């Protein structure tokens, strides 16, 4: 009985978090298809064609591609572009495709940030725009109310969302039930719309109106925005609850609502100005606006939480500098708050709301990031099919090729909307890609320079003569290299002529798996003469904690008393140079990011009163 309750609870929670983005798409998808930047005449023929496109887009891109196929490609239970990237880079290590695929994964992560800025803006705007259905006089209040709602949402992030998070599931369940009931109520008026399930209507629409249908693809794809979240959030809820929630509630509710909007437009073509809020009687408009606003806030929360998670993954995978990561829940390790990400998103979202003014204007900006990410996911998962699942190559080509062809059609239909707003996610994607690759390249150059300057440990051990005194206690030297002597140790020997009785050379590494169990966290080897090499491993979904890791060294016969342990860190100062490696402007960007990174003591949770920092200068 308790297991059944847990399953139901997990299902309700999954509905509240996973399906928020795709669940709020009915607010604007049909409206933008018929009344957007490339309007389509509201006629039964066109309505049937668009409904058929919507149905098969949802079935192919979400149900078949993500729910059935890509959700099988988990990285030890975790999903998402960076988890998939880590899995694929591990599978292709040593192959020619390794580096290009890694770049593709970084591009997907960069596009995600463009998407995560647009989603809160377009979702909440589209909900509040329901006020215009009540009376056009309320139009002037749409942007201020949207800004107020979003400001409140971003302001509470630092306090965590555990308390209000319990309401997400029930509210979203109510939302999907409402979608279904509104759809059924309108389908009854024109039940013939259900015939649009047949793909012949979509095919005929494309053949008869090739240009119109091409434009329609650019807005029909709005019906699947958020589909990738089903894969991204797999680590939080598991594959089964997400699939169960999709097939039992979300998919039927979405399709019923889209077909209900189609039935409404057949009966009343004038309803195209905002078909969603005209699906019910007039007295329902205000309650629907309130419920829609709650649903879009929940959808936005899911995107914001996803942005925090991706930021942590990027830091751990060496794509971003250290940032402050705050755990907002003592019970749920996945609930984190990243201040820099939060406020960067907030100001970008505010700029979008104020700059674009309406969900219709923002719709043009929405599709590029989503379709670009979906296309990259298909490419990455094709290598999983071939190398991990060992599918026949002909089958891989047929399945991946078909999905890629569909993805590309939607991407092409959105790329033509660059001038109408599509430039924004491309701009954000370019900035994000530049930052991610600059940091990764910069750290690689730093490691190369340190290795070039490194002194072999055996040389130092031989040089420890009678003139070098041994201080009591333990010294832990943090170093990125797993061989050689850290610069901080060399500086200590040079200036103080002393080393501690026990010296630990500690290196923190990130595995290409989401989690590393405590049993595999540390590995300590005795080098001799009181020196030890310590490797500390974390997964890309974990936050490092060095004092906690040191307590695990008991298995190697070592105990650490924090009051007699000193931590020595190298504080690197970088000097941009004309050496080959990176353009001068990128070297300056890397230096700027390094200066503004969270201090190692904070990031690694090292007691500040036990830290000694020694400076070192490097040319990159």
UniProtKB/Swiss-Prot annotation:
User: What UniProt keywords are attached to this protein's entry?
Assistant: Cell inner membrane, Cell membrane, Ion transport, Membrane, Potassium, Potassium transport, Symport, Transmembrane, Transmembrane helix, Transport
GO-annotated molecular function: potassium ion transmembrane transporter activity; symporter activity
Report if keyword Glycoprotein is assigned: no
Membrane-spanning residues: 8-28, 50-70, 102-122, 136-156, 168-188, 211-231, 246-266, 284-304, 336-356, 368-388, 393-413, 415-435
Cellular component per GO? plasma membrane
Q: How does it sit in the membrane?
A: Multi-pass membrane protein
Reaction(s) catalysed by this chain, per the record, are: K(+)(in) + H(+)(in) = K(+)(out) + H(+)(out)
Q: Where in the cell is it found?
A: Cell inner membrane
Q: Does the keyword Transmembrane helix apply?
A: yes
Question: Which InterPro entries does this one have?
Answer: K+_transporter, K_trans_C, K_trans_N, Kup
Task: Give the residue range of the signal peptide.
Answer: none
Q: Which family does it belong to?
A: Belongs to the HAK/KUP transporter (TC 2.A.72) family.
Give the protein's biological function: Transport of potassium into the cell. Likely operates as a K(+):H(+) symporter.
Q: What is this protein called?
A: Probable potassium transport system protein Kup
Which taxonomic lineage is given here?
Bacteria, Pseudomonadati, Pseudomonadota, Alphaproteobacteria, Hyphomicrobiales
């Amino acid at each position: 009985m308790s297991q059944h309750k847990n399953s139901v609870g997990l299902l309700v929670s999954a509905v509240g978090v996973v399906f928020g983005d795709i669940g709020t798409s009915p607010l604007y998808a049909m409206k933008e298809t018929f009344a957007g930047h490339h309007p389509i005449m509201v006629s039964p023929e066109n309505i049937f064609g668009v409904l058929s496109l919507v149905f098969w887009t949802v079935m192919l891109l979400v149900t078949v591609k993500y729910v059935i196929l890509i959700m099988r490609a988990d990285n030890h239970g975790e999903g998402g572009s960076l988890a998939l990237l880590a899995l694929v880079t591990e599978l292709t290590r040593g192959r020619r495709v390794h580096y290009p695929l890694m770049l593709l994964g970084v591009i997907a992560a960069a596009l995600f940030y463009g998407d995560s800025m647009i989603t809160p803006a377009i979702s909440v705007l589209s909900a509040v725009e329901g006020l215009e259905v009540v009376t056009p006089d309320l139009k002037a209040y749409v942007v201020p109310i949207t800004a107020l709602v979003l400001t409140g949402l971003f302001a509470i992030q630092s306090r965590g969302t555990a308390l209000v998070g319990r309401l997400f599931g029930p509210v979203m369940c109510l939302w999907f039930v409402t979608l279904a009931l509104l759809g059924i109520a309108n389908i009854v008026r024109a039940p013939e719309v259900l015939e649009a399930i047949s793909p012949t209507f979509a095919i005929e629409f494309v053949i008869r109106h090739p240009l119109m249908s091409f434009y329609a693809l650019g807005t029909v794809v709005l019906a699947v925005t958020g589909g990738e979240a089903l894969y991204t959030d797999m680590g939080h809820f598991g594959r089964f609850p997400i699939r169960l929630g999709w097939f039992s509630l979300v998919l039927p509710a979405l399709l019923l609502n889209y077909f209900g909007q189609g039935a409404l437009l057949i009966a009343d073509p004038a309803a195209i100005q905002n078909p969603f809020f005209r699906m019910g009687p007039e007295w329902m408009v205000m309650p629907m606006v309130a419920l829609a606003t709650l649903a879009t806030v929940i959808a936005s929360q899911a995107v914001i939480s996803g942005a925090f998670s991706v930021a942590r993954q990027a830091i751990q995978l060496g794509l971003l500098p250290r940032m402050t990561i705050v755990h907002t829940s003592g019970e749920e390790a996945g609930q984190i708050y990243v201040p820099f990400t939060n406020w960067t998103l907030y100001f970008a979202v505010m700029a979008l709301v104020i700059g674009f003014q309406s969900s219709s204007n923002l719709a043009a900006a929405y599709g590029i990031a989503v379709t670009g990410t979906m296309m990259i996911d298909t490419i990455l998962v094709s290598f999983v099919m071939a190398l991990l699942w060992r599918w026949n190559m002909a089958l891989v080509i047929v399945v991946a090729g078909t999905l890629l062809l569909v993805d590309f059609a939607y991407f092409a239909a959105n790329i033509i909307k660059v001038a109408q707003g599509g430039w924004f996610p491309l701009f954000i994607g370019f900035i994000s890609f530049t930052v991610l690759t600059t940091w990764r390249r910069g750290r690689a150059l730093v490691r190369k320079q340190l290795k070039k300057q490194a002194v072999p440990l055996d040389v130092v051990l031989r040089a420890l003569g009678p003139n070098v005194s041994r201080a009591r206690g333990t010294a832990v030297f943090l170093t990125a290299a797993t061989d050689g002597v850290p610069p901080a140790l060399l500086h200590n020997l040079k200036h103080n002529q002393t080393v501690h009785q026990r010296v630990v050379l500690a290196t923190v590494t990130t595995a290409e798996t989401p989690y590393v169990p405590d049993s595999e966290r540390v590995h300590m080897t005795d080098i001799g003469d009181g020196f030890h090499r310590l490797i500390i491993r974390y997964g890309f979904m974990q936050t490092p904690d060095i004092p906690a890791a040191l307590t695990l060294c008991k298995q190697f016969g070592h105990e650490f008393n924090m009051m007699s342990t000193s931590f020595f860190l190298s504080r690197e100062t970088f000097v941009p140079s004309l050496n080959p490696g990176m353009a001068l402007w990128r070297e300056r960007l890397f230096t700027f990011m390094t200066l503004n990174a969270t201090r190692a003591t904070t990031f690694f949770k090292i007691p500040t009163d036990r830290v000694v920092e020694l400076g070192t200068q490097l040319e990159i």
